[in-house]
Amino acid sequence: MEKIDSKICLRCLYDKGIVTFSKKRNPFNHPSVMYRKKDVLKAGNYSDVRYMQDYYLWVDMLIAGMKGYNIQEPLVWMRADSNLFKRRSGKIYVEIQVNLFKKMYKAGYVTYPQYLKSSAIRVCSASAPNWLRQFMFKKVLRK
């Protein structure tokens, strides 16, 4: 029987905090997102990129001036195993992430230094051994 870790991670972000956070990381937990279909279509719908379609969409919606909100109570319980961290590595994954930040830069959503910093962080993270990436996600990013 699997031991359940009841650690809860909330994204305690509001309007301006969501915009600021989105310039570094995904501001929403996709499984618990609700939105108006007309707003998604207005922002261009989901991209056909291989990974991170949700992050691309949230950025497109925020660039279009739409507002987001994080409900301050957990709605979904999710587990993360080592495969989650393995999927967040490799050349293709880095290219997709860097392209997202390039798109954000070209739209004027992030500055050039923000684009460079975020891209460098993604390259380092995806190049790191799986155990180190897992440690960083659990101990640094989810604190």
Task: Name each region found by the language model.
Residues 122-143:
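Terminal low-complexity segments of carbohydrate-biosynthetic enzymes
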Residues 68-69, 89-90, 106, 125, ...:
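Short alpha-helix boundary/capping motifs
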Residues 2, 6, 10-91:
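Conserved nucleotide-sugar donor-binding catalytic segment
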Residues 78, 86-111:
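Catalytic core of nucleotide-sugar-dependent glycosyltransferases
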Residues 115-122:
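Amphipathic alpha-helical repeat scaffolds of TPR domains
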